[in-house]
Amino acid sequence: MAATFFSGFKDEQSALAFLLEQIYEGFQMQSSICVVLKDEKYFDEFKKAQQQKYFEKGKIEYLYDKNISLLDSKPADEFDEIHILSDKVLELPTNVCENVYVYTTKANEGITKASRELYANLKKNNFDLSHQAV
């Protein structure tokens, strides 16, 4: 079980654009992917970012989302990957996923604070943790 924390995004748009780049491989492998977003505004921004990536890259995969579950709370089902840009996930059960990716922005202190608490809880559960400043 591994978790990677990405920090340093100036706003949610830049975090969502990076998140889409990260899950692009999941589209290819048909992985089951969970994306936990803060609220309805973030859901709308995610959909806009998908379309923007499609127009930038010209790859239809950015519009395919049948293997993506969009949630606004802690996931209960098992997934191949979980991507979190939310202040509502403070812990995860060890059986829910092998690969967790957490994104924080300078613009949202609530998400940053929640990710710190999630980091501490995942460490207690023996996740292999890494951090990348973007």
Predicted regions, residues:
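Glycine-rich phosphate-binding "P-loop"
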Residues: 1-15
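Short, well-structured hydrophobic secondary-structure segments
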Residues: 16-64
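Short glycine-/acidic-enriched loop or helix-start segments at secondary-structure transitions
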Residues: 45-46, 93-94, 112
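Structural motif
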Residues: 8, 36-40, 84-88, 105-107
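Residue-level preference for the first positions of well-ordered beta-strands
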Residues: 3, 32-34, 81
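Glycine-rich, aromatic-bearing surface loops/beta-hairpins
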Residues: 99-134
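Mid-chain, well-packed structural core segment of small domains
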Residues: 64-100
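A generic structural motif
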Residues: 57-72, 129-134
